[in-house]
């Protein structure tokens, strides 16, 4: 079965993103296809390259990045929500005249069209 996940909670502070990550791992372990994860609202904080959890905590941001690298899962973040919360890639940083970018490698700024496409092409869309 083909799945897409929508994450609306930040990497730290709530259980949403952590539960979504564990669900993603379980899907793959059970042989399902996870085509994409769409980060929306506060979920865009999962793509912030500048997070630095304590050394004894799981690094969820890098966990998502590894999911992308190892399994080819698309990690799309809503561009409008990201810009409002200070998450920018190099292109947007240049366009906005910002000194640097902070989008974690493996993540892509996307519009809501990416979520709509996932909704149409996947068997299930699960929101956390």
UniProtKB/Swiss-Prot annotation:
Class in the EC hierarchy, top level: transferase
Any Pfam family the entry gives: DsrE
Main location: cytoplasm
Any one GO biological process: tRNA wobble position uridine thiolation
EC number: 2.8.1.-
Record's subcellular location: Cytoplasm
Complex and partners: Heterohexamer, formed by a dimer of trimers. The hexameric TusBCD complex contains 2 copies each of TusB, TusC and TusD. The TusBCD complex interacts with TusE.
Protein name: Sulfurtransferase TusD
């Amino acid at each position: 079965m083909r799945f897409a996940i929508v994450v609306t909670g930040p990497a730290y502070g709530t259980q949403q993103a952590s539960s979504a990550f564990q669900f993603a791992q379980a899907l793959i372990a059970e042989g399902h296809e996870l085509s994409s994860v769409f980060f929306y609202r506060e979920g865009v904080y999962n793509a912030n390259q500048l997070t630095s959890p304590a050394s004894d905590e799981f690094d969820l941001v890098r966990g998502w990045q590894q999911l992308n690298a190892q399994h080819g899962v698309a990690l799309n973040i809503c561009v409008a929500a990201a810009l409002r919360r200070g998450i920018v890639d190099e292109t947007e940083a240049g366009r906005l005249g910002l000194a640097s970018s902070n989008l974690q490698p493996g993540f892509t700024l996307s519009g809501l069209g990416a979520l709509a496409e996932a909704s149409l092409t996947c068997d299930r869309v699960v929101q956390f």
